[in-house]
UniProtKB/Swiss-Prot annotation:
Residues 62-91, 338-402 are annotated as: Disordered. Residues 71-91, 380-392 have a biased composition (Basic and acidic residues). One of its GO terms (cellular component) is extracellular region. Belongs to the SctB/SipC family. Its main location: secreted. This is Effector protein BipC. It comes from the Bacteria. It is found in: Secreted.
Length: 419
């Protein structure tokens, strides 16, 4: 047992006084209860004698300066506060086990230091229980002689509590910094996901514009080829079919003349000739037989010679018309191919755009997952920091309570000494 006088620098250590005090706790049963009062009385007497002698000597030495005030150091708490101390530290230990891995090493060391100071107490209790089983008479004396330390009754323990609070504050700052980083990561992931959305929209717009332009171009080219095909057919009808029809009509008329049908006859004014205009524009004059029964031999010979040439021209008009139809068909096919090629190109552009959009969506999913992971990590970090702050607050509250208890005990002892 130690008593320190802080203002005067007195530090008194009395082993006999400790043995007298501890002797009152070594007895059991009714005898322990009876002897407890005598032991406490002897302890008070010894305490008063020792303090009186040392204080009187000190008072004589400083009588000239008028210093009469004596301050006592904080004594150890009694058995009631020890149970409170143990419960408090047990709570700190449980909180320490529940803390996340985000704690700084200094905070963990402070918790371990506080818990370690009470491990010796638990070991002493266990040794006491085993000693009772082995020898009922020797165990109480061994337990009384064994040193017992309580964290909240030691000045170093209070320093540890204060260091714990400071370390927890630093840990809070570290948690805030980490939460800020995680929030920035989540923000960056969100911005990247938004950029992927814009990229998908741009890819869709590009595909739509390119596909539309290609399809419009090929459709226009195909329409122009189809127009050429129709124009070729129209030209063939105008230049080939119409002349062919006129030649066929003239050829039929000449054939009728050769057969004597609708042959020319003399009119009332007795015209002796007739003029025939050929398809070349040349006008040929033929004499008419005054008998009116048949054509002249010269007329029939001319008509017979011109018939094969007219038939050849009729056949050539038909062949050229067929060639024009073939040309128009090729133009029509080219137009259809252009339109089909435009549709195929548009489908290819849509496929490439869909592939790019799929890749962008995959990256977007990755960014969203990264954002969710960062937010979950930030939430976990915040929860761990909250638990750390709660544990630190409990430790600080326990230290404050212990200080108040020690002050009350010191005031009571000082009052007893004055009386």
């Amino acid at each position: 047992m130690s008593i320190g006088v802080q203002s005067s620098g007195i530090n008194i250590s009395h082993a006999g006084l400790s043995r007298l005090v501890d002797a009152g706790k070594s007895e059991q049963g009714d005898k322990a209860v009876r002897d407890d009062g005598r032991a406490l009385a002897r302890a008070d007497a010894a305490l008063a004698a020792v303090v009186g002698e040392r204080v009187a000597a000190r008072r004589d030495a400083v009588a000239g300066s008028g210093a009469q005030r004596v301050e006592l150091a904080r004594p150890k708490p009694d058995a009631q506060t020890r149970a409170t101390d143990r419960r408090t530290v047990s709570g700190l230990e449980r909180e320490h086990k529940r803390l996340a891995a985000s704690q700084t090493p200094r905070v963990t060391g402070m918790h371990d230091a506080l818990v370690q100071r009470h491990v010796s107490l638990d070991g002493a209790k266990a040794a006491h229980g085993e000693g009772v089983k082995r020898a009922a008479g020797d165990a109480p004396r061994a337990a009384a002689d064994a040193p017992q330390r309580f964290a909240f009754a030691d000045d170093k323990a209070f320093d540890a509590m204060l260091a714990l609070g400071a370390a927890m504050q630093k840990n809070v700052q570290s948690d805030l910094a980490m939460q800020g980083k995680l929030t920035m990561l989540a923000h960056d992931a969100m911005m990247s996901a938004a950029a992927q959305d814009r990229s998908i929209g741009a890819a869709q717009m590009t595909a739509a514009i390119a596909g539309g332009a290609l399809q419009a171009t090929t459709s226009l080219g195909g329409a122009m080829q189809q127009m050429k095909s129709l124009s070729t057919k129209s030209m063939s009808i105008e230049k080939e079919l119409k002349p062919q029809a006129e030649l066929k009509q003239f050829h039929a008329e000449q054939a009728l003349e050769l057969r004597g049908i609708n042959k020319p006859v003399l009119s009332n004014d007795e015209v002796s000739h007739v003029k025939i205009k050929r398809d070349t524009g040349e006008t040929v004059r033929h004499e008419i037989d005054h008998g009116g029964e048949r054509m002249s031999d010269e007329h029939a010979s001319v008509l017979a010679q011109e018939a094969p040439a007219r038939q050849h021209r009729i056949d050539m008009h038909g062949m050229r018309h067929e060639e024009n139809l073939v040309k128009a068909g090729r133009q029509q096919m080219k137009g259809d191919l252009l339109q089909s090629g435009g549709q195929i190109g548009k489908n290819q552009i849509d496929g490439a755009s869909a592939q790019q959009q799929g890749a962008d969506r995959a990256e977007q999913k990755e960014d969203e997952n990264a954002q969710q992971t960062a937010m979950a990590a930030a939430s976990t970090r915040d929860e761990a920091a909250h638990r750390s702050r709660e544990a630190a607050q409990k430790a600080i509250d326990a230290a404050k309570s212990q200080v108040a208890n020690d002050n009350a005990v010191a005031a009571q002892v000082a009052g007893n000494l004055r009386t």
